């Protein structure tokens, strides 16, 4: 827990320093949130000093906390997402579901998909025997979502053997 506390303190100090220079920027992109705790204090300060574009690709307003972070639940504020969206000049949402939520607070919403549309972008056919890497881009606190894929990944590994590896 002390390691997480150190991360929070470092993040707070970094954001405080940024406030001094924020007027130098025409646009400030906020991805997810400016500070991990429940307050929108930093986002409100940023909005007074610059133009905010909010970019998100997860349903972060839902009150979901992993088992690892349950002790810190009281520090979270799911309503924060809507408040940040209201402060923003533009919102980039990763999909239609997120865009629909954002539209409740801000009409200037654009969908920027976080997944690749394989109907538009066709993978190149591979003729070589290189290994294929399958990666996970989640975090320790969202590992339960990854765990739902384990059976499928085992089947892939059984079928393709050493041609496939995981990161």
Regions found by a protein language model. Give the residues of each.
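Acceptor-binding helix/loop patch of EC 2.4 sugar-transfer enzymes
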Residues: 1-5, 53-82, 117-119, 129-130, ...
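Short His-centered aromatic/hydrophobic patch
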Residues: 30-36
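Conserved catalytic-core segment of nucleotide-activated headgroup transferases in glycan assembly
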Residues: 117-121, 127-167
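Membrane-proximal helix-turn-helix segments that form the acceptor-binding/catalytic region
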Residues: 11-25, 37-48, 54, 58-62, ...
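Hydrophobic residues at beta-strand termini and immediately following loops
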Residues: 112
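Helix N-cap/beta->alpha junction signal
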Residues: 32, 95-96
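Carbohydrate-associated surface elements
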Residues: 97, 115
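Hydrophobic/aromatic residues located in beta-strands of well-ordered beta-sheets
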Residues: 52, 91, 109, 164-166
């Amino acid at each position: 827990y002390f390691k997480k506390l150190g991360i929070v303190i470092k993040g707070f100090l970094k954001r405080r320093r940024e406030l001094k220079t924020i007027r130098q920027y025409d646009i400030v992109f906020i991805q997810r949130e400016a500070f991990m705790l429940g307050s929108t204090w930093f986002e409100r300060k940023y909005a007074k000093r610059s133009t905010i574009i909010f970019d998100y690709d997860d349903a972060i307003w839902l009150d979901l906390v992993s088992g690892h972070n349950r002790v810190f639940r009281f520090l979270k504020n799911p309503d924060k997402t809507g408040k940040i969206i209201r402060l923003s000049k533009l919102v980039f949402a990763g999909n239609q579901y997120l865009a629909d939520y954002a539209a409740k607070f801000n009409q200037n919403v654009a969908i920027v998909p976080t997944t690749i549309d394989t109907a538009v972008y066709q993978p190149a056919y591979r003729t070589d025997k290189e290994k294929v890497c399958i990666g996970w881009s989640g975090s320790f606190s969202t590992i339960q979502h990854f765990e739902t894929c384990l059976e499928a990944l085992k089947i892939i590994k059984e079928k393709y053997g050493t041609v496939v590896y995981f990161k």
